[in-house]
Each structure stands twice: as structure tokens, then as C-alpha cells.
């Protein structure tokens, strides 16, 4: 079996930065305890489990405000997906120490929404409902930001001005965003468009589109909650024309997927730990359909290998 290792794949700089920020927080004895992450720091359970070993508690819930209601003291880390001004204010009112790990690309979108609101615009924001990134973006200006996920959402959308900005969640499929933007332009011809697919997401999607077409199967390594991982599987199927499965780690690979397969493409979401992806590739490289000794699929990567290394600051 030939393995096509799609490149680039895996961690983006925003994810690494967020994890380093959280790791440094865990090592900072001056921060009030307990230390909480407001939702998953990045959408990968292996990462949140590793942080739990570091003493950092991940809390989840229907919204960031709902999660904050569970916290009465300590330190709160805002995730890479960003939060609304209301969340920041609520944390301040509760007397919590806050650390912001928002991805710079997300911050750029928030700044754009604020600037356009000041100019009297309404904003159409293309994103996944019930995902934390759109929650934070809509929360920048909930009175003028309209979240849409599908073309059907446009049918009932009415905006009381011709000053309209269209932007999007950074981890969406660029092809889905393009199709929706074309539909929006037909309904709102005066709209201005700012496509905000982050570069890391874009190049990973384009790599799958160009490299997965030679494979019989694509395996995307990523958490089920990771939007960018799910979009990579979608790109493989819809753009490259190659059947794809998303797995959290090697243990989720089903042997029947590999029957009759000669070429397997492997990629990983931007929040997927590199050792988890390497373990998937190593399994596929040694797999022999005629040898049951090669069929074992058990995650063996220790959690302490998941998080980035950071230097412990010496006290002066």
C-alpha cells in the first residue's frame, strides 16, 4: 500500500500559539487557581486531555456566557476561536484573571466587524451555527451581524440598508464560502466582500484538492468537533473526488475501509497533534491485509507528547 502524505497538514500557528499560551499559564505559579479554559482551547480532545494532566480544566457548554456561569474564581483562558466583548466584560465583573489566546486571524475579523459597524454597515457572516468562532464574531455587534450557514438562510434574510459587508468563519471550506458569496451578491448587489479563510486553512484545503485525487481513499486525522478537519474530508470527496473518512486517531480506522485500496492519502486538521498523525501513518505503512499481526489499531501516544514544549522562566 502506498501512502500519500499530503503536505502541508496539521498544526497552524494560531493553534500552536494558543497551546503555548495555555502551557505557560499552567507553569505560572503567580496565576490564581484553578485555571479554566473557556471551551476547548483548540478542537481536539487529545489536547484538552493533555492540558487536564497539566492541571488546566476545560469547561464546555452551549455558549461562552453559560460556561462563565460555572466559574466563581481563578483564571480563565479564552480559546483560539475568540470571544465576544460581553464575555470579556462578564469575566471582569466576576473578578477573574483572563488570558486571551484568540487566533490573530480571528481578531482581524472582529476588528473588521467593529470598523464596519462604526460606518453604519450591517454584516452577513458565513459560519457554522453552534460553533464558538461565529458565536464570538456575532457577539461583536449582535444587532447588525447576521449569521448564515446555508443558502436557505438567505431566503428570509432582510437587511434595512445597502451598506453590507460579507465575511466568514476562518475555517470554512473556501468553495462553500465562494458559492454562498455568489448567492449573496445576487440578492444584495451592493454588498462588499471580505473573504477571511485563514491562510493555513486555505493551503491545507488546496493541498487536499490537488494531492488526494491520486489516492483511492483519504484519511483525515482530526477531532469530530474540528470544523477545519471536517472540511478537509469534504474537500477530498467533493473537489478531489476521493472518498474520505475523518478519524480522531489510529484506533478509529476500520479495516474494511482498506479493502482493495492501493493508495491512501493522509492529512490532518490544524488542531491535530503531530504525534497522533504520525501514528496513523505508521500503522498504514506497516499494514498488510494478509497478516493479522499488522491489524492492531491502538493509540499509544502518551499525553505528555501532545503539548508543545515551553521554557520555564527562571525567577529573578
From Swiss-Prot:
Its EC number is 1.17.7.4. Gene3D superfamilies: 3.40.50.11270, 4-hydroxy-3-methylbut-2-enyl diphosphate reductase, catalytic domain (3.40.1010.20). GO terms for molecular function: 4 iron, 4 sulfur cluster binding; 4-hydroxy-3-methylbut-2-enyl diphosphate reductase activity; metal ion binding. Its cofactor is [4Fe-4S] cluster. (2E)-4-hydroxy-3-methylbut-2-enyl diphosphate binds at residues 43, 81, 131, 170, 226, 228, 271. Catalyzes the conversion of 1-hydroxy-2-methyl-2-(E)-butenyl 4-diphosphate (HMBPP) into a mixture of isopentenyl diphosphate (IPP) and dimethylallyl diphosphate (DMAPP). Acts in the terminal step of the DOXP/MEP pathway for isoprenoid precursor biosynthesis. Belongs to the IspH family. PANTHER family: 4-HYDROXY-3-METHYLBUT-2-ENYL DIPHOSPHATE REDUCTASE. This is 4-hydroxy-3-methylbut-2-enyl diphosphate reductase. It comes from Bacillus thuringiensis (strain Al Hakam).
